């Protein structure tokens, strides 16, 4: 057991394992990790602009354009001109994007359940709650 291990080291080990497990699940759905993150943010509602979406994701705005281009080409997102700023684009999830995200999230939740099999349902819920609070506090 790693009771004395620093939180950063513990998070790094778990994060690495989660990413290794998620990557093939997302690839099977035709998504990269960052494309999935973008869809996840858009499930919460349309992004006021592409720049705002990049900020919400903590991702480089210039690199996000290529991801959004691909998602738009696949019909998963729509970008429309911002009526208040012709240079800006509003990003919205399409029904196909919502469905693809739901499929990917279901795959990930199944994997997470298997990974957390050693924890009770209550412990799993507590872990998710605490991690959510930590993530919110971190920004």
Briefly describe each language-model feature range.
Residues 1-29, 117:
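N-terminal leader segment of winged-helix/HTH proteins
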Residues 16, 20-63:
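N-terminal helix-turn-helix DNA-binding core of bacterial DNA-binding proteins
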Residues 136-139:
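Short, charged, intrinsically disordered terminal tails
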Residues 19, 47, 51, 69-132:
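Charged, amphipathic alpha-helical coiled-coil/dimerization segments
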């Amino acid at each position: 057991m790693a009771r004395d291990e620093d939180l950063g080291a513990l998070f790094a080990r778990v994060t690495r394992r989660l990413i290794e497990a998620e990557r093939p699940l997302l690839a099977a759905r035709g998504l990269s990790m960052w494309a999935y993150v973008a869809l996840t943010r858009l499930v919460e509602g349309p992004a006021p602009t592409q720049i705002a979406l990049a900020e919400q994701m903590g991702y480089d705005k210039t690199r996000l354009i290529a991801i959004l281009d691909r998602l738009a080409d696949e019909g998963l997102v729509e970008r429309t001109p911002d009526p208040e700023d012709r240079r800006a684009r509003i990003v919205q999830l399409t029904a196909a994007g919502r469905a693809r995200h739901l499929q990917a999230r279901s795959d990930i939740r199944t994997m997470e359940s298997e990974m957390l099999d050693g924890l009770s349902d209550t412990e799993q819920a507590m872990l998710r709650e605490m991690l959510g609070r930590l993530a919110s506090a971190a920004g």
